[in-house]
């Protein structure tokens, strides 16, 4: 029955890829292993699939097969990629594929859709490919010809992302560079609701069944963790400069890693990602601005009124009240934590491995959440060793640095043979161009040796804002064993 359903929603033929397979397997595990909980609380998905044969047909139709063969050779693996990316972005689709895409759009009507990568190797054990391939939101409004053109552009963008430097280096680092990696696509109706000109889910998040960021010694890593945001899940998946998801350990959801109320406010969500039907694409809106124009958001479940800030706003003539996205009511007065904990533990048991999931939430009139599971994959960042025994009575002169807590990645013991450090004081005095020069130089030094390397630097590694850290790319630091952000 499942295979027949997939076939009825498949454009072309071939494989549907790892991401689509993971989503379907995870949903079936929940419905079969805990039907009494998930049949009423797991929202049905509305997914279509663009098979791997459509990817091959696109390459052949545009005369790109010889270039693909050259790119697969060791000498052409990186050098052929830029021209391939450019050619893919300007390629045309075979008539039979275009016809099936038109039927796909007829099915979705004018609901927003998300075009997601689902390559053959993606989301497999040990190969998360997190953030390496593109996903594209489409408003899906307007004339049929316009909607088809936008869908084709989105598909080209995802296809082209398979030839990005980051993706190619990631595959090579894991010994996958000489294996087939055809790109299938998972096309889904975006889960959410219309709020006037805006479309967004109530909330979205990323959950992991093992908490590798246990900032308190009383927390049980096996209880899991969640990063939760209001609106689209892009702000939960990605590290956004200057804005923060709500991070909760599922065994202590009320315990936050903040020292005072100012930190709690600073490290919270102030911006909301949503689809703007008038602008025609994904937009980011300040929460206060969104609440000025949208009155039917479930704020009573997701936030709390900041009384002091509301009083100050009233005194200077600003509209109120002032809301803070804490998600405390959702945690305290609904089944959210219990349901998410059950979801993660059930999937970990089914996979026989810790898992990483993405989901959206629909909050009903009683304040209870239902889940839409959009992705599930084996958690790729758990430690590679058992418990690590630290040496006792280590002489001070042999200790380079020491830190406790705020560590991610699980237990691991490595013999570090090289340390690269960016001096924070010097870096702070550099201009923007000089900071990009530092990032390029770091990449050059990393690639000079395959030795086990510890990289230490100020702020965030991989930031897109040089004032907040070192703007390296994944390809620059893929060979590093451990990162330290000071």
Which residue ranges define each predicted feature?
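Conserved mixed alpha/beta core segments that line enzyme active sites in large multi-domain catalysts
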Residues: 1-37, 92-485
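A conserved helix-loop-beta module that forms one wall/lid of the active-site cleft
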Residues: 4-70, 74-95
């Amino acid at each position: 029955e499942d295979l027949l359903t997939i076939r009825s929603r498949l454009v072309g033929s071939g494989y549907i890829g790892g991401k689509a397979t993971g989503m379907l397997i995870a949903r079936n595990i929940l419905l079969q292993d805990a039907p009494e909980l998930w049949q009423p609380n797991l929202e049905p998905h509305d997914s279509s699939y663009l098979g791997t044969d459509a990817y091959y047909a696109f390459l052949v139709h545009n005369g790109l097969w010889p270039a693909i063969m050259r790119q697969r050779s060791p000498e052409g693996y990186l050098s052929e990629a830029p021209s391939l990316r450019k050619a893919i972005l300007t390629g045309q689709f075979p008539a039979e594929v275009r016809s099936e895409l038109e039927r796909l759009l007829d099915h979705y009507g004018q609901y927003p859709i998300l075009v997601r990568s689902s390559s053959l190797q993606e989301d497999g054990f040990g190969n998360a490919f997190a953030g390496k391939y593109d996903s594209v939101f489409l408003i899906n409004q307007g004339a049929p010809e316009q909607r088809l053109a936008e869908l084709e552009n989105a598909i080209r963008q995802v296809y082209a992302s398979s030839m990005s430097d980051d993706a190619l280096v990631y595959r090579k680092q894991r010994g996958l560079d000489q294996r087939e990696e055809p790109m299938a696509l998972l096309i889904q109706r975006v889960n959410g609701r219309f709020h006037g000109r805006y479309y967004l889910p109530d909330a979205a998040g990323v959950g992991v069944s093992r908490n590798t960021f246990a900032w308190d010694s009383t927390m049980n890593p096996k209880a899991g963790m969640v990063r939760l945001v209001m609106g689209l899940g892009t702000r939960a998946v990605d590290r956004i400069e200057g804005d923060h998801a709500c991070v909760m350990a599922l065994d202590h959801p009320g315990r936050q890693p903040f020292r005072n109320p100012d930190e709690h406010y600073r490290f919270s969500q102030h911006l909301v990602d949503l689809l703007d039907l008038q602008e025609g694409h994904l937009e980011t809106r300040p929460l206060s601005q969104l609440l000025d124009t949208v009155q039917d958001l479930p704020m009573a479940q997701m936030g709390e009124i900041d009384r002091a800030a509301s009083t100050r706003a009233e005194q200077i003539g600003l509209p109120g009240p002032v809301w803070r996205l804490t998600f405390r009511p959702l945690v305290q007065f609904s089944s959210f934590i219990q349901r998410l904990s059950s979801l993660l533990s059930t999937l970990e048991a089914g996979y026989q491995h810790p898992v990483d999931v993405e989901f959206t939430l629909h909050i009903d009139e009683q304040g209870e959440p239902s889940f839409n599971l959009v992705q599930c994959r084996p958690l790729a960042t758990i430690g590679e060793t058992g418990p690590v025994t630290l040496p006792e009575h280590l002489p001070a002169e042999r200790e380079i640095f020491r830190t406790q807590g705020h560590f991610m990645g699980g237990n691991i013991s490595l013999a570090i043979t090289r340390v690269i450090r960016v001096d924070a004081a010097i870096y702070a005095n550099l201009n923007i161009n000089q900071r990009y020069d530092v990032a390029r130089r770091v990449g050059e030094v990393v690639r000079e040796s395959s030795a086990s390397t510890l990289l230490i630097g100020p702020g965030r590694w991989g930031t897109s804002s040089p004032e907040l850290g070192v703007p390296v790319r994944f390809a620059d630091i893929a060979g590093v064993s451990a990162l330290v952000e000071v």
